[in-house]
């Protein structure tokens, strides 16, 4: 039987093309049942307050960077979305007088400007590099801060960024949020065309993707307008540069942070269910993490919500 057409964008793959049994099973999950989805290689953590949630996220930076030395440098790959952890990272480094000069940081993704064929400049209001620098790195005291050469931001020419993953720097953890389309970074589902017209790419095919320029699923564009631009879809680029699965599998741990601001109650349940049950389908890119050896999903309990029907 052919796969369903997307309910959102018929020319694309996404989670609405999944079997109804998966959809219904995920929607039935309570927070307590989500905790029980944990298995070897997949940990589920719930935080009762946002303060605890974002502090725990910030501490992953500190824990990674404290391991770094000049001879054995260590880094973390981090997202924009969420961002609330970033000022906490800078405050912790400064207040603990933590020397992170040997440490590294990889940005996960960046917007692509189709007019110039390059990444958006840091002057762009939605620039992820701009946000990382303004919210975190420019706030760390210069005497403690790593040099610019240790900050790796994706560019349209991805060669230097991809090479930075193979220079002997250990990535202790890759953090991420989860978008409405169930991506990490901008690893979106692919368009439904060509050899992928009748079936999405196989997991093995998707896993071969490296850092690259991508076309964004319409749901991703709408989400970023909602979360970052007051709903102004026209200001959101339609293409982006994203870290790929190849780089993701070079991280010792993948840590996904669900505050309830980005993906919705159903999405937060769906990906945990698929990762736990090892249901890997590239129409839900986050499900590929089922095959990573060390994944942790972190939830703010107050942001998990419910999939019960409520009319507004």
Language-model segments: residues:
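ATP/nucleoside-binding phosphotransfer catalytic cores, i.e., glycine-rich phosphate-binding loops
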Residues: 2-17, 36, 41-42, 47-49, ...
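Ligand-binding beta-strand-loop-alpha-helix segment within the catalytic cores
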Residues: 23-45, 98-175, 235, 299
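Glycine-rich phosphate/diphosphate-binding loops that line cofactor/substrate pockets in enzymes
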Residues: 58-72, 248-249
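ATP/pyrophosphate-binding catalytic subdomain of soluble kinases
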Residues: 59, 154-198
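Glycine-rich N-terminal segment of FAD-binding domains in flavoprotein oxidoreductases
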Residues: 66-97
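Gly/Ser/Thr-rich loops at beta-strand to alpha-helix junctions
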Residues: 76-86, 177-183, 261-263
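A glycine- and small-aliphatic-rich helix-loop capping segment at beta-alpha/alpha-beta transitions
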Residues: 89-100, 122-124, 189-198
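Class I SAM-dependent methyltransferase SAM-binding "motif I" and its flanking Rossmann-like core
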Residues: 185-237
């Amino acid at each position: 039987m052919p796969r369903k057409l997307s309910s959102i964008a018929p020319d694309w793959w996404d989670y609405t093309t999944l079997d109804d049994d998966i959809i219904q099973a995920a929607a039935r999950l309570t927070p307590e049942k989500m905790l029980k989805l944990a298995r070897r290689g997949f940990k589920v953590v719930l935080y009762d307050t946002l303060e605890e949630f974002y502090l725990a996220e910030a501490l992953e930076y500190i824990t990674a960077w404290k391991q770094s030395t000049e001879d054995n440098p260590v880094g973390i790959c981090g997202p924009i979305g969420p961002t609330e952890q970033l000022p906490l990272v800078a405050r912790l480094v400064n207040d603990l007088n933590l020397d992170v000069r040997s440490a590294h940081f990889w940005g996960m993704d960046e917007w692509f400007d189709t007019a110039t064929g390059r990444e958006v400049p840091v002057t762009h209001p939605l620039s992820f590099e701009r946000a990382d620098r303004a919210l975190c790195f420019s706030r760390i005291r210069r005497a403690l801060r790593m040099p610019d050469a240790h900050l790796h931001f994706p560019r349209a020419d991805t060669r230097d960024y991809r090479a930075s993953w193979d220079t002997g720097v250990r990535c202790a953890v890759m953090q991420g949020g989860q978008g409405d389309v169930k991506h990490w970074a901008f690893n979106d589902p692919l368009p439904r065309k060509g050899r992928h017209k009748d079936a999405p790419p196989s997991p093995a095919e998707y896993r071969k993707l490296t850092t690259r320029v991508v076309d964004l699923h319409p749901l991703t564009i709408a989400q970023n307008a909602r979360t970052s631009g007051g709903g102004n879809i026209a200001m959101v680029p339609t293409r982006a540069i994203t870290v790929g699965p190849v780089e993701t599998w070079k991280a010792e741990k993948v840590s996904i942070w669900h505050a309830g601001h980005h993906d919705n109650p159903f999405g937060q349940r769906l990906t945990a269910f698929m990762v736990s049950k090892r249901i890997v389908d590239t129409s839900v890119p986050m499900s590929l993490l089922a095959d990573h050896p060390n994944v942790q999903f972190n939830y703010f309990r107050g942001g998990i919500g419910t999939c019960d029907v409520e009319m507004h």
